[in-house]
């Protein structure tokens, strides 16, 4: 009985303590906010994720309504914040913009997604 109880406790501990290792990184927040309308031209798009990211394998692409790329292509992690990804924007005018991301979290899982925001000064 004692051996079965110990095995059950070991199994339970393994499940509980390894749960973090299987957590994928999901978008937790963004600026501009998904679906929002902003009145001032943002200098950059900032994305906040639930898990640490691998910068070398994480990308952000921002396009206008015609599909033209309007980011500077320099997505990088925020200094001291391994869950925050930033990409500077070119000078943009009024319209709808699409933000697409593809990130690799430290658990080695790739997650991607997109959202839009509108600029209406």
Where do the PLM segments sit?
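Extended, polar beta-sheet/loop recognition surfaces of beta-rich domains
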Residues: 40, 44-51, 108-121
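N-terminal edge beta-strand
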Residues: 23-41
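Cleavable N-terminal signal peptides
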Residues: 10-11, 21
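Bacterial N-terminal signal peptides that target proteins for export
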Residues: 1-9
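Short strand-edge motifs at loop-to-beta-strand transitions and within beta-strands
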Residues: 83-87
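A glycine-anchored, Pro-Gly-centered beta-turn/N-cap motif
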Residues: 93-102
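Short, surface-exposed alpha-helix to beta-strand junction/turn motifs within ectodomains of secreted
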Residues: 46, 51-73
């Amino acid at each position: 009985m004692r051996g079965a109880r110990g095995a059950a406790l070991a199994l339970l501990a393994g499940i509980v303590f390894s749960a973090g290792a299987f957590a994928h990184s999901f978008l937790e927040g963004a600026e501009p906010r998904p679906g929002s309308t902003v009145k001032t031209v943002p200098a950059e798009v900032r994305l906040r994720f639930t898990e640490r990211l691998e910068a070398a394998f994480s990308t952000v692409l921002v396009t206008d309504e015609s599909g033209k790329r309007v980011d500077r292509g320099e997505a990088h992690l925020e200094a001291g914040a391994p869950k925050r990804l930033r990409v500077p924007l070119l000078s943009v005018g009024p319209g709808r913009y699409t933000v697409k991301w593809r990130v690799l979290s430290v658990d080695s899982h790739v997650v991607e997604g997109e959202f839009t925001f509108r600029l209406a000064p």
